[in-house]
Curated annotation (Swiss-Prot):
It comes from Buchnera aphidicola subsp. Baizongia pistaciae (strain Bp). Binds 1 divalent metal cation per subunit. Can use either Co(2+) or Zn(2+). GO terms for biological process: amino acid biosynthetic process; aromatic amino acid family biosynthetic process; chorismate biosynthetic process. This is 3-dehydroquinate synthase. It is an enzyme of class 4 (lyase). PANTHER family: 3-DEHYDROQUINATE SYNTHASE, 3-DEHYDROQUINATE SYNTHASE, CHLOROPLASTIC. NAD(+) binds at residues 67-72, 101-105, 125-126, 138, 147, 165-168. The gene is aroB. The keyword Secreted does not apply. Belongs to the sugar phosphate cyclases superfamily. Dehydroquinate synthase family.
Amino acid sequence: MVNLGKDTYPVYIGSNLLEISNIFFPIESNTQVAIITNDVVFKIWNKKITYYLHKLGAQVKNVIISDGEIYKNIDTVEIILSTLLKYSYCRDAVLIALGGGVIGDITGFVASIYQRGIKFVQIPTTLLAQVDASIGGKTSVNHVLGKNMIGSFWQPSSVIINFDFLNTLPRRQLISGIAEIVKYAVSFDVNFFNWLEENLERVLKLDYSALSYCINRCCEIKISIVEKDEKEIHDRMLLNLGHTYGHAIETFLGYGTWLHGEAVSVGIVMASKTSELLGFMKDNDITRIISLLQRVGLPISGPKNMSFESYISNFKRDKKVISGKLRMVLPVFIGNVKIFSNVHENILMSVIKNC
């Protein structure tokens, strides 16, 4: 449960969740439902989701968009809005985000602006979305000049994290999601990091108990922080380890060239080395982080053709910038992160040059 007063909502985690009778709250008989999904997920899972919704008596339409970060933009928002208007969806309609982080972000954003706000349900189908993006109410689309620059805070009515979806997840997407798991461990829980070092192969093999532990632990951390700081005034920024460097890489390369977790992986390494130059992170901790990321199969170095100037120009549009001052989330040691302001450009240049 995410306790946010009037915006409190349940988070269901497990297998075979779709068979639970009240799992699709607040959907009931005659509710107008629009399933927002992509062409890949639609082929595999839509029939099953629709079956259970029809059993409830819901009126269901599908809005199918192309798969990929490149489609997370205002044009896609227009397509979804036009569909809702075409079929006269009312303010008591419910949207379902059936997909990964891209689908969840777009659907939440549409829900926040359609007729000044309607309800939506998150059904994340990727590991990355299950451990991070589906919880907390951040919604957004990208702009050509920056990732997630157009968005809002709009909490879902419920989140359904069903492990069964991971059985059909492409390997690259699975590996990308593990980057966010590593982020949580490095940022908040050294015991979790130690556990990952010992049990990584079980996670990669989709061992049920290992996945359950990882997903539950990440969600516990995320929920505890969101409950304290829903709108990212301070504490919630700590969830952004690796994202300043990572978002810059994604924007430079073009959305979708690298998956989000791949960029975050490099961002975690760069943030760790930035902290080391500031006198905090120890070399042994950085070695352990790099070793774990390499075992996962994630990149640890940025694009060779990305210049220092390209990083800096993207940093200036980072959402953590306040009054022109860049704030970065950096690890102090494994299990602890802090926000640093105005890291000197010479340090940033050294990190970028050597990563």
